[in-house]
Amino acid sequence: MPRGCALLLASLLLASALSATLGLGSPVKEKRGWTLNSAGYLLGPHAIDNHRSFHDKYGLAGKRELEPEDEARPGGFDRLQSEDKAIRTIMEFLAFLHLKEAGALGRLPGLPSAASSEDAGQS
């Protein structure tokens, strides 16, 4: 009897190992892809606003309301101005570097010469 139990246990272990390696086990449900509902939930309302293939339902409240735009939030306008200033500063610096590389800075009136007193002291 113990020999029969050991043989049964060994055969069950062998069968489970073979079925797992060959893919004969219980099939796992596959994910089929995105549905409109899951994409709208995960990506938010702004991702699907640009692509409207269904009838628009204006005025009806959905499960969630659209959040106010950045300008409508408190402090949003100030934040936009500071971002604009930072972008403008970066653009001016890049334009300066481009002019400096092209050698056009020497031809502009009112600018100091390219070789400053610090550069002359280092030579």
UniProtKB/Swiss-Prot annotation:
Keywords: Amidation, Cleavage on pair of basic residues, Hormone, Neuropeptide, Phosphoprotein, Secreted, Signal. The modification Alanine amide is found at residue 61. Its main location: secreted. GO terms for cellular component: extracellular space; secretory granule. The modification Phosphoserine is found at residues 116-117. SMART domains: Galanin (SM00071). PROSITE patterns: GALANIN. Residues 1-19 form the signal peptide. Belongs to the galanin family. This is Galanin peptides. The gene is GAL.
